[in-house]
């Protein structure tokens, strides 16, 4: 995608129709990409360096501190008694941990180890169990209050507050998981899957008391973001410190000792390197789009193709967002779509926040949509 936009910028004067322009020398493109405000060192990489890395480390710390296992036990205690309970527990656990981890595919690999065998054990088919895990893990990215790192990136991008984004995203997230719950329940009725005996389920209060401290870092995050209105990066640092401190309330095997801290930081930074490389490359794309004007032309083309009709524009933007999101992780997918697709909706007087939420919802759908559906792998 990025190389195609670079080629378009350089050879624009040889291209027909929508892509035609004056064309720019490679030296101009390199200058724009390296020195321009919208280039490699522009907003995408700046957000990755200041915000995303902190929350990727936060997710890795929570994972090393045993949070994923506790979320799974809590989810079982809350929903395991109902028909198809383990599948509903998988939805709850994957949603809770997916919101923290920020990576649908990574979350599927982490929680899926527990949830998929559990769903298969009570009678769900392997394909359905994997599908439930993939959909729930992806939905964690749109679930407040954390929403991976997307809420913080969006706040910077459209110049609004984190609180406003959380409020706007709450109802769609509830509807998303309500539909997943209903699907799981109906499939359980269809397959004749009964509820697990309560004797086989963990008790709510013993489980809650055993791991209530895993909720404290999330409370710290909300406090510093909403009440103290700290920048997301600073709030994330305090949250990481809270994870470290509360880990010593967990069983000794989950204490964040120096060795486990190194492992968590290593894992978080490894995830960030991928994001940083992609966001830097996206910066090159944004620089090329700014130089060539193709981004504006694409937005206008979509609106013109839809005849200025908002419904048709939403359909076109949704389809393109689904295709563009394939193969990208959540954060790079959002940045790419915010650059290419959101302006088309804003041009039709759709509020910026609604436009950005719309494109990321459709972009994330690519995680469980063939042919790529990387959360399924």
Predicted segments, located by residue:
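Transmembrane helix-loop boundary segments of multi-pass membrane transporters
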Residues: 151-152, 156-175, 232-234, 358-364
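Long, contiguous bundles of hydrophobic transmembrane helices that form the permeation core
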Residues: 1, 167-271, 374-377
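Core transmembrane alpha-helical segments of multi-pass membrane transporters/permeases
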Residues: 5-26, 30-69, 233, 237, ...
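Hydrophobic transmembrane alpha-helical segments of multi-pass transport and channel proteins
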Residues: 142, 161, 173-178, 232, ...
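Membrane-interfacial loop-to-helix junctions in multi-pass transporters
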Residues: 38-51, 77-90, 122-128, 209-215, ...
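Membrane-water interface of transmembrane alpha-helices in multipass transporters/channels
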Residues: 160-167, 233-237, 294, 312, ...
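Hydrophobic transmembrane alpha-helices that form the pore/transport pathway of multi-pass ion
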Residues: 72-140, 150, 159, 330-365, ...
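Hydrophobic core segments of alpha-helical transmembrane domains in multi-pass membrane transport
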Residues: 4-13, 51-61, 94-98, 156, ...
